Structures are given as C-alpha cells and as structure tokens.
C-alpha cells in the first residue's frame, strides 16, 4: 500500500468510529468569557467547563480556534456521565491592540454536534 491509500483508510476508519459513538448531553458553564484588559504582548487564557449531563461518555473530537494566534488545551478528551472537563483557549496578544473577540468551535458526540466558545479581551498598547 502507498501512503495515500493508508491515509485514506485511516481517515475512513476514524470517521466510522466517530459516527458510531453513542450520543450524550453536555452543559457548558460559560460559552462567552470577558477577560480583564491586558497590555499587548501578554498571553491570556479563558477557561470553559463542559459537564457531561448525559448517559454516555463525552468525547471531544476536535477544538478549532478561528485564529492561529489562539491555541487550546483540553484537560481530558473523554469524560464520563456526571463528570466534567475543561477547555482552555490561549491567546497571544502580540500585535493585537484593541478589543479582540476570539472563538473556537468544539465538536463532540452530542445531539448538538458543534459548540462555539468565545472570549473578548481589550488589549492595550
């Protein structure tokens, strides 16, 4: 097999895996976070808590920030019913003076497949 076929098979298997997961429910404490004003060049972090309120394990398939200036960290890629996990969005304010509204899309095995997590921060010169 060549690399193209192997990669295609891998992506198909992953797609089948995600489609076969049982759905669960999630509650997100704050989908929009207002951060304190900071000086340009500082790095800031916004935190979001996702509670698994359903009957099946919650899997985070991906987190997709809308800007390369925003990274992310997930405390756990899976959480069981009754438990929670955290997603942290990390923003580098270098060269971003002014009011910044940033977001990331999160995909999980829930009836609402996509969630938008956002934050706003005023970056001072």
Regions found by a protein language model. Give the residues of each.
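Short, exposed beta-strand-loop hairpins at the edges of beta-sheets
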Residues: 105-112
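Surface-exposed loops/turns
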Residues: 40, 81, 96-97
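Short, surface-exposed loop/turn segments at beta-strand-coil junctions that are enriched for proline
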Residues: 92-98, 109
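Beta-strand-rich interaction surfaces with strong enrichment in secreted/lumenal proteins
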Residues: 34-36, 74-79, 92
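Surface-exposed binding patches on compact interaction domains or structured appendages
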Residues: 55-83
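Beta-sheet-dominated interaction scaffolds and their linkers
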Residues: 3-53, 120-125
